[in-house]
Amino acid sequence: MFRKLLATVAAVAACALLLFWLWPSDVMEQEGQSKESAITLLAQTDDGDDVTMRVEQGEWEETVSKTQEQGESRVVTDSHVDFQAGAAGQGAGKKGQEMASVVLMTTPRGKDCHLTLSDGTRVWLNADSKLEFPEQFRGARRTVRLSGEAYFEVAKDSRHPFVVETEYLTTTVLGTSFNVRAYTVSDASVTLVEGRVQVASPSVRKPVVLKPGQRLDVVGSRFSMNTVNTYAYTQRKEGFFYFPDDTMRQIMVELGRWYNKAVVFEDASHMNLRLHFVAERTQSLAEIVNSLSEMDGVNIELGSNEIVVK
C-alpha cells in the first residue's frame, strides 16, 4: 500500500510554494563513453552515508551568511530531531542571551531528516541538503538558511516572519506550508499550492502575484507562467516519488540523487520522454528500475555505480 523559488519571494498571505533550481553541472558530456551522444546526469558522490548535526556557539547574524567549518559533527540516528523541547521563554523576538548556538543539519544522498525547530516549525530536509538555523530563534525574524531542498510547515507568528534564505533567493512567510528547492541557480521557479504569494526577481519587471496552481519559471532573463498539478509538491514528505507528467530527465535526476548513482542517457532524445510514475521512496533502486522498464519506450539498465537509459 502507498503510504503516503538575486530573487525574493514574499508571502502576502498564507501560502504554500515550491522553488526549483537544477545543477549547472547536471547535464555534462560523459568522458570515455563509446557513444558520442551519451550524456551523464548527476555524477555519483562520496560524501558519506549519515545524517549529521553540528552545533556551534556563536552569534547568529541574520544578514550575513555563515560558513560552519569548526565544531564536531555527530551522526543523527533519530527519525525526528526536536529543538522545541526546552525552548520555553526563549522564543522569537526575545533577545535573551547575545550568543546562541548555531545548528547545521546535513543529509547525504539517499537519506532525509525530519526536525522540529524551536518555534514549532516542522521541516522535512531532503537528501543531499543542508539547513542552518539558530537553536533558539531571537530577534524580529525567524531566519534559516538552506542549500538543497526542504518542506516546511511553519508555526504561525505574525509578529516574527519566517524567512528561508538560499544563495540566490529569499522566501518570507507568516505561517504556512511550502517546499523550497535550491540545489543550484541555473533554473528557478515558484509554485503556489495554496494562499497568495508575490514574486520579485531581476527577470521580472514588476512583482508577480501567483494564484494557487500556478508556477512562475525563470530561466536567465526570461520567465513564463504555467498551470501545474500541485499535489506532486507535497508527496516527498509523505514518502513518495510522485511524477504526474515529468520528463525522463527530471525523473532520473531525482532517482540519481536519492540512490547516489550517476545517470547516463545513451540517446539524449530520451530525456524528453514524459511519464506518469509513482513509487515509494523506501523501494530498492532495482524495484524502481524494473517498474520503469515495464513502461512503453523505456529501456533502463542498472549498473553498480550508474543508471543507464538506452
Language-model features and meaning:
Residues 4-10, 20-310:
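A residue-level detector for the "anchor" residue at the start of short, highly conserved motifs
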